[in-house]
Amino acid sequence: MAVDRLDIDMKTLEDNSDLRQVEFEGEVSEERYQFAVQYDVLEALSTVAPEGDAVAIFRQHLDEIADLGVVALARDPDQEIVVISENDLD
């Protein structure tokens, strides 16, 4: 059985500093979803506070975020926006 993969649409990356998350769209198993990764996750991955550089940090950790997105989606596939939080880290 093939493992689901999150294909992130890089054109949709948006830093929502008010909510402290980077929002984006992605596709898993040919279905499109809205995602957001919290700043806390970006900081845990990079060991750097993401203020002002959140999208750059996101790009540096793209593969890890894609993996975490699949985990977050499996946790609750019916969310309007799938939020990747520290709970999704190993």
What are these model-derived regions, one by one?
Residues 2-5, 49-90:
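Acidic, low-complexity intrinsically disordered segments
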Residues 7, 12, 41-44, 88:
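Residue-level preference for alpha-helix termini and adjacent loops
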Residues 1-27:
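Short, charged/polar N-terminal "headpieces" of proteins
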Residues 21-46:
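A short, structured beta-strand/loop element
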